[in-house]
Curated annotation (Swiss-Prot):
InterPro entries: Ectoine_synth, RmlC-like_jellyroll, RmlC_Cupin_sf
Source organism per UniProt: Streptomyces anulatus (Streptomyces chrysomallus)
Gene3D superfamilies with a match to the protein in the record: Jelly Rolls
Pfam families from the UniProt entry: Ectoine_synth (PF06339)
Class in the EC hierarchy, top level: lyase
Enzyme Commission code: 4.2.1.108
Any one biological process term the GO annotation gives: ectoine biosynthetic process
Protein name listed in UniProt: L-ectoine synthase
Length: 132
């Protein structure tokens, strides 16, 4: 059994701050735990815009605080995401988040991330392994 709190993660290598300056993420469960998924709490900052494309991962996101506009960049469809709303990127959709307020969410990734990932120039997380 693993028990881990946010205070255990803050200011460690599990507390990732994006090079873009638009978000930070506490990586709670990672690939090295070998449970088949990773679990993160992520905050996207108010007034920013983050374009993403999880070409190598499936992501489920549950908003716990704040508000943001989610745009499916492939269809142009937009959704207003508020606390209690979930979205699932089951088709590797390119998407953009525009938080109106600081937007806090819980994210699950499959395959699990290692904790070292950040979005590349295409908004993609590279597919890293624990051996990499």
């Amino acid at each position: 059994m693993i028990v881990r709190s946010f205070s255990d993660i803050e200011n460690t290598d599990r507390h990732v701050k994006a090079a873009s300056g638009t978000w930070e993420s506490k990586r709670i469960v990672l690939a090295k735990e070998k449970v088949g998924f990773s679990l993160h709490e992520t905050v996207l900052y108010a007034g920013t815009e983050t374009s993403m494309w999880y070409a190598n991962h499936i992501e489920a996101v549950l908003c716990t605080e704040g508000e943001a506009e989610l745009t499916n960049d492939e269809t142009g469809e937009t959704h207003w995401i508020t606390p209690g709303t979930m979205y699932l990127l089951d088709g590797h959709e390119r998407h953009t988040m525009r938080p109106k307020t600081d937007f806090r969410c819980v994210c699950v990734f499959n395959p699990p991330v290692t904790g070292r990932e950040d979005h590349d120039e295409n908004g993609v997380y590279p597919l890293l392994t624990e051996e990499a």
